[in-house]
Amino acid sequence: MDKVFELKNVSYFYTPKVPALIDISFDVKLKEKLFILGANGSGKSTLLKLMDGLIYPHEGQIRFFGKVIGDKRTFDEYEFRRRVGFVFQDSDVQLFNTTVFDEIAFAPLQMGVKKEEVEKLVNEILISFGIEKLKDRPPHRLSGGEKKKVALASIIVINPDVLLLDEPTNGLDPRSKKWLLSKLEELNQKGATLVIATHDLEMAKKFSDRIIILNEEHKIETIGSPEEILNDEKLLLKANLI
């Protein structure tokens, strides 16, 4: 099956009269780099949380490789958590262990990987991400770019098939941003499917395969190629992206 996610008529409400998302339908294809663009408050973060099963839609359904997320009869929560990683916009939300090493080791230990194997995996990730010198540091004392690296490393260590990333370049300096894009490209080349919510048009232009625009009415405005969407000034103005 080449559809990783299938969303059909998904709606979510903060309160009965305050919608976050209305009638959202789209598919995510295997190994693609799908960008979700929208102004602040359009529902991008909520959409990623729905796709990660952190919250559930009030209307419609979301399927992951054909199985409805949250369906107690057919949905395997453990398998889903192994295959899908979520990188939050605010790295501090994600980082809660006392050292960088423990942070990266947390997920594989929770998955039941043997301690010796976990140590090997973590050391490999530390080297791959160029953060081996940080392994004994408390995550909350790191710079923004370092925190983002640790947050991503703590997800990559379990080798997920899918990465959901919420504003991954937010607050990063140019060097850290360049590193992040290079690492995401490397992961995609190895087969990872990427779903990225952002209002970073430059990143979308360089990196996306397909783009979804969320409007300020919390609906999908359009879906198309980077060329179609990013060259349409009227569309970008309407969506409050420029």
UniProtKB/Swiss-Prot annotation:
Organism domain of life: Bacteria
The principal location of this protein is membrane
One GO cellular component from the entry?
Answer: ATP-binding cassette (ABC) transporter complex
- Keyword Nucleotidyltransferase present in the record's keywords: the answer is no
Drop me one GO molecular function for this one.
ATP hydrolysis activity
Q: Where in the cell is it found?
A: Cell membrane
Q: Which SMART domains does this one have?
A: AAA
Q: Which UniProt keywords apply?
A: ATP-binding, Cell membrane, Membrane, Nucleotide-binding, Translocase, Transport
Q: How does it sit in the membrane?
A: Peripheral membrane protein
PROSITE patterns found in the cross-reference section: ABC_TRANSPORTER_1 (PS00211), ABC_TRANSPORTER_2 (PS50893)
**EC number per UniProt:** 7.-.-.-
Described function = Probably part of an ABC transporter complex. Responsible for energy coupling to the transport system.
What family name appears in the similarity comment?
Belongs to the ABC transporter superfamily.
Q: What is this protein called?
A: Putative ABC transporter ATP-binding protein TTE0246
Q: What is the lineage of its organism?
A: Bacteria, Bacillati, Bacillota, Clostridia, Thermoanaerobacterales
